[in-house]
Amino acid sequence: MSSSCIEEVSVPDDNWYRIANELLSRAGIAINGSAPADIRVKNPDFFKRVLQEGSLGLGESYMDGWWECDRLDMFFSKVLRAGLENQLPHHFKDTLRIAGARLFNLQSKKRAWIVGKEHYDLGNDLFSRMLDPFMQYSCAYWKDADNLESAQQAKLKMICEKLQLKPGMRVLDIGCGWGGLAHYMASNYDVSVVGVTISAEQQKMAQERCEGLDVTILLQDYRDLNDQFDRIVSVGMFEHVGPKNYDTYFAVVDRNLKPEGIFLLHTIGSKKTDLNVDPWINKYIFPNGCLPSVRQIAQSSEPHFVMEDWHNFGADYDTTLMAWYERFLAAWPEIADNYSERFKRMFTYYLNACAGAFRARDIQLWQVVFSRGVENGLRVAR
């Protein structure tokens, strides 16, 4: 049964409801209220399901049409800003994860290729419509931009300026996605690029996009790389590495970077070190992911590099995600035959929940520039 067929129901006056109502009221959210961030319950078992199953129950019950919210992004932002997780009754703290407080906080899995097949191979029909022409599935830079395309191009330009690219350089792009950055670097800075991805769909599109340029796209694990590059860049890939592999990751970068080279890391980050796994994101979105913390990045990079610059523009990811959501909704009539209504609700939940988390400053977006100690230092672009 679709969610549109399920009418709002009278909420049961039991302990499940009372606990949920008390918690949500602390965030200024009403049950069956009329404000944009209020939730409308369509199944009386909703409260029990969420309190018993936590984040997974919250997300799956939305996918099943058990509850609605006009502005999911506002709902998550309010819940996270209120710090509800820290206000839970003691005996619920291990199981209750209302609002998915760490939506990207996922542990790494041994089989790194899973994420390529589960998420990035969903289909280019979806991503090509939702993303900008450069197919950037990472945070845009909105400082002087007023639309997604210009904001993503501003991000690409800033990356290249931070890397201080010069004609003839060899550049390694770890986690190259659909080849947008590789294409931009090769066509605008006359550099040779090697891109690495674990998604067959991404490799195919990246090769087509970069045809005629000095760009090679490899379908392989980054740990197998053994070459020499003037510059290395990694955008939106470190989230899939996992804490147990952070030391290996920086060792691989060190092994492949020339002595005078520069490395730029672009990653979502956690405001504190936490290895907990969010079961909903782990099951439906990124089966191989975990957000790094400042401490983890510093510890793993310290044996190899000098940290030249740390740039946080996480607030821009909120704007980016809402732009993606707007384009996703606009494109849905064109792609609906390829996906289920439940998939639409899943992706709606994912984009809005993440936007709310960035808006609440619960998660961050960092660009970190490393060298081995460039003489006279680096003047890093903004």
Curated annotation (Swiss-Prot):
One Gene Ontology term of the molecular function aspect: protein homodimerization activity
Broad EC category: transferase
The enzyme's E.C. designation: 2.1.1.79
Catalytic reactions on record: a 1-acyl-2-(9Z)-enoyl-sn-glycero-3-phospholipid + S-adenosyl-L-methionine = a 1-acyl-2-(9-cyclopronane)-acyl-sn-glycero-3-phospholipid + S-adenosyl-L-homocysteine + H(+)
Subcellular location(s) per record: Cytoplasm
InterPro entries the record matches: CFA/CMAS (IPR050723), CMAS (IPR003333), SAM-dependent_MTases_sf (IPR029063)
Matching CDD domains: AdoMet_MTases (cd02440)
Active site as annotated: 354
Activity modulation comment: Inhibited by sinefungin, A9145C and S-adenosyl-L-homocysteine.
Primary location class: cytoplasm
Domain of life: Bacteria
Binding site for S-adenosyl-L-methionine: 137-138, 171-179, 197-202
Domain statement: Each of the subunit of the dimer contains a smaller N-domain that associates tightly with a larger catalytic C-domain.
Primary role: Transfers a methylene group from S-adenosyl-L-methionine to the cis double bond of an unsaturated fatty acid chain resulting in the replacement of the double bond with a methylene bridge.
Subunit comment: Homodimer. Homodimerization is required for catalysis. One subunit probably binds to the lipid bilayer and positions the other subunit for catalysis.
PANTHER family tied to this protein: CYCLOPROPANE-FATTY-ACYL-PHOSPHOLIPID SYNTHASE
Name under which the protein is recorded: Cyclopropane-fatty-acyl-phospholipid synthase
Gene coding for it: cfa
